[in-house]
Curated annotation (Swiss-Prot):
Gene from which the chain derives: PDLP3
Protein name, as recorded: Plasmodesmata-located protein 3
Taxonomic source organism: Arabidopsis thaliana (Mouse-ear cress)
CDD domains to which the protein is assigned, alphabetical: Gnk2-like (cd23509)
Pfam families with a match to the protein in the record: Stress-antifung
Signal peptide: 1-26
Deleted gene: phenotype: Both pdlp2 and pdlp3, and pdlp1 and pdlp3 double mutants show altered protein diffusion (measured using GFP). In pdlp1, pdlp2 and pdlp3 triple mutant there is inhibition of GFLV 2BMP tubule formation. Virus cell-to-cell movement is negatively affected. There is a 22% reduction in mean surface area of infection foci by GFLV and an approximately 12-hour-delay in long distance movement in comparison to wild-type plants. There is also a systemic delay in Cauliflower mosaic virus (CaMV) spread.
Quaternary data: (Microbial infection) Interacts with Grapevine fanleaf virus (GFLV) 2B-MP.
């Protein structure tokens, strides 16, 4: 086999290795905390003939993304006049690092535009952060207003689960107040997490969390997991019969703890693809080495 074929194989090997790198990058570029939980879009479209609202909205997005490198909560109002101002905020989950917070929040402006378009108010909630904005004069809602709920499909009634979950709820409610707005813990294989919006006091936070937990008990019953999102706080729980998995955040995504099997399936698929691509790359490298040796031997015999 000539030098030209060897060159082709070398190029193929480089392409395979590049693909392998892209697969690893793609896997690491979509962390758990960027999963979309829900969106809330005002029905009324934004009338903006002067473009002032758009300017204020763009400035607000820029401020929120910039501040997400320094803090997990930030609220601001932008605009040239009070009539054309926009108030917005973001909040990251309390267990995220500054870097993770930024990675989460930086996705929200684009997502908000894609999911809601230009409306007078919008809210986009990911697993690890959310963004909210509204124009001046937008009607306010109660902090206890239910925005979104989800309960796991599997039930675990009759196993003592509800008693354990309710005990975990009590621990979490006290912990959120003591933690000034965020708390996560595990109690007898029940993982619970609660967080309040960063601009409310401990007393209001406690009331909001209590309301959310009561809703979780009623709405989700004996479901293996659940999430309740109110306007000013949210709670989530998940029961893991075999123990809470050791990972950066076992906070349940918007299905149930059964969703962990989905994550596991995704991870298995990724590993399988990586093994196939890696194996192919290894074989390709071996073939190239053998051909290189063959060419050297051929050249040696040609010289005699």
């Amino acid at each position: 086999m000539g030098f030209y074929s060897l060159k082709q194989l070398l190029l193929l090997y480089i392409i395979i290795m590049a693909l392998f790198s892209d697969l690893k990058l793609a896997k690491s570029s979509s962390p758990e905390y960027t999963n979309l939980i829900y969106k809330g879009c005002a029905r009324q479209r934004l009338s903006d003939p002067s473009g002032l609202y758009s300017q204020a909205l763009s400035a607000m997005y820029g401020l929120l993304v910039t501040q997400s490198t320094k803090t997990r909560f930030y609220k601001t109002t932008t605009g040239t006049t009070s009539q054309t101002s926009v108030t917005g905020l973001f909040q990251c989950r309390g267990d995220l690092s500054n870097n993770d917070c930024y990675n989460c929040v930086s996705r929200l402006p684009v997502l908000s535009g894609k999911l809601c378009g230009k409306t007078i108010a919008a809210r986009v909630q990911l697993s690890g952060c959310y963004l909210l904005y509204e124009i001046s004069g937008f009607a306010q809602i109660s902090g206890m207003e239910l925005l979104f709920k989800t309960c796991g499909k599997n039930n675990v009634a009759g196993t003592g689960f509800e008693q354990r979950r309710d005990t975990a709820f009590g621990v979490m409610q006290n912990g959120v107040v003591q933690g000034h707005g965020f708390y996560a813990t595990t109690y007898e294989s029940v993982y619970v997490l609660g967080q309040c919006e960063g601009d409310i006091g401990d007393s209001d936070c406690s009331g909001c969390i209590k309301n959310a937990l009561q809703r979780a008990q009623v709405e989700c019953g004996s479901s293996i997991s659940g999430q309740i999102y109110l306007h000013k706080c949210f709670v989530g729980y998940s029961f893991y019969p075999n123990g809470v998995p050791k990972r950066s955040s076992p906070y349940p995504s918007s299905g149930s703890s059964g969703s962990s099997s989905s994550s596991s399936s995704s991870g298995t698929t990724g590993k399988t693809v990586a093994i196939i691509v890696g194996g192919t790359a290894g074989v390709g490298f071996l073939v190239i080495c053998l051909l290189f040796v063959k060419n050297l031997m051929k050249k040696k015999y040609d010289d005699y």
